[in-house]
UniProtKB/Swiss-Prot annotation:
One of its GO terms (molecular function) is ATP-dependent protein folding chaperone. This is ATP-dependent Clp protease ATP-binding subunit ClpX. Residues 1-53 form the ClpX-type ZB domain. CDD domains: RecA-like_ClpX (cd19497). InterPro entries: AAA+_ATPase, ATP-dep_Clp_protease_ClpX, ATPase_AAA_core, Clp_ATPase_C, Clp_protease_ATP-bd_su_ClpX, ClpX_bact, P-loop_NTPase, Znf_CppX_C4.
């Protein structure tokens, strides 16, 4: 090789490789950088962005740790908590290792929660986002329609997530989206519809792209106020989607698949009180085929590989929800009354009465606040005016049932006969 040819060979200023050893050499003022070094720099930057965008890579809690933290806010639903702990751990572990070059590509596993109203579906998803410190958004499937129809476009869900993290696209990519009432967009029959289904199958098709991973174009902050601004491009491939629904009568579909008791004279006669317990057992046997028969399209069911069920909360669980979690209702009202310098005491029979009423109303844990709020409305209205000298307010079952007023105990006053009976 002549000296002139040697002088013409260019080298990367970072790794020292020649132009013949790399695919491309980019020239700058008196320096050169090869494509391999550019890729390496991109990987370093991407790792830092993932670490900053929600801390998914920093100190990711293990499944048992996630389960323990869920226990602080959610009562019961042990199986669902175990499933979610593993699923979320694997999802963020996958995100934290995406920059490493590997022949195995791990797919995203979105989650479907099946359970009655007030069983804790939304709270579980919300608490997971809080534990992992990632952006979280809730969408109601019943408000969604196909693009071009009156209603909420499915891509508005991503906009809600962006709003939660101040339009930080990289942070939004590591977020969690919970879509509630997903069972309400099931088509009416398990055969493809010939007519236009604006809020059913069509919405499932639109959500399908979003859930499996697409680049959504979202208006920037301010929206139509700044039409000259470019749309934000959000890749949904790494956003974890959790869908939830009550799926009323799903147990009937499962029963038809599993029931071997026969029909007519051969059928087993069950007492009415066993129906609810039987339905709960059947729901635990849910398979993808049952959801397709219910009205979800096969492609949509396929994008929700992790299916877990939640049980209906009984009286004991509802009483624990009132007192045990970090943000328990009783603790919240105690704090509110503390602001006025007054103590509030909920007797056990009062908690029992609240739980019974929630079961009667079929609202589960979701209805507890409205029952307590309604019970204490008059008391909280008058409290600022009567708080002076008041030491304690006692709430018993009579107050919940509106049969008797709350018991007031003032400073330097002996407990009333009713309170002394404790």
């Amino acid at each position: 090789m002549s000296s002139d040819e040697k002088l013409q060979i260019l080298y990367c200023s970072f790794c020292g490789k020649s132009q013949h050893q790399v695919r491309k050499l980019i020239a700058g003022p008196a320096v050169f950088v090869c494509n391999e070094c550019v890729d390496l720099c991109n990987d370093i930057i991407r790792e830092e962005e993932i670490a900053q965008a929600g801390g998914a890579q920093k100190k990711l809690p293990t499944p048992p740790e996630i389960h323990r933290m869920l226990d602080e806010y959610v009562i019961g639903q042990e199986f669902a908590k175990k499933v979610l702990s593993v699923a979320v751990y694997n999802h963020y572990k996958r995100l934290g290792n995406q920059t490493k070059k590997d022949s195995v590509e791990i797919s995203k596993s979105n989650i479907l929660l099946i359970g009655p109203t007030g069983s804790g579906k939304t709270l579980l998803a919300q608490t997971l986002a809080k534990i992992l410190d990632v952006p979280f958004a809730i969408a109601d499937a019943t408000t969604l329609t196909e693009a071009g129809y009156v209603g909420e476009d499915v891509e508005n869900i991503i906009q809600k997530l962006l709003q939660k993290c101040n339009y930080d696209v990289e942070k939004a990519k590591t977020g969690i989206i919970y879509i509630d009432e997903i069972d309400k967009i099931a088509r009416k029959t398990d055969s493809p519809s010939l007519t236009r289904d604006v809020s059913g199958e069509g919405v499932q098709q639109a959500l399908l792209k979003l859930i499996e991973g697409t680049v959504a174009s979202i208006p920037p902050q301010g929206g139509r106020k700044h039409p000259q601004q470019e749309y934000l491009q959000v890749d949904t491939s790494n956003i974890l989607f959790i869908c939830g629904g009550a799926f009323a009568d799903l147990h009937k579909i499962i029963q038809r698949r599993t029931d071997k008791s026969g029909i007519g004279f051969a059928a087993e006669v069950r007492p009415k009180e066993d129906f609810s317990r039987e339905a709960s057992k059947l729901i635990k046997q849910t398979e993808p085929g049952d959801l397709i028969k219910y009205g979800l399209i096969p492609e949509f069911v396929g994008r929700l590989p992790i299916i877990t069920t939640l049980e209906e909360l009984d009286e004991d669980a509802l009483m624990r929800i009132l007192t045990e979690p970090k943000n328990a209702l009783v603790k919240q009202y105690r704090k509110l009354f503390e602001f006025e310098g007054v103590e509030i005491d909920f007797r056990e029979d009062a908690l029992n009465a609240i739980a019974k009423r929630a079961i009667q109303q079929k609202t589960g844990a979701r209805g507890l606040r409205s029952i307590v709020e309604h019970t204490l409305l008059d008391l909280m209205y008058d409290l600022p005016g009567v708080a002076a000298g008041l030491r304690k307010v006692v709430i018993d079952s009579g107050v919940i049932d509106q049969a008797s007023p709350p018991i007031f105990i003032y400073h330097h006053e002996k407990a009333s006969r009713k309170v002394a009976q404790e």
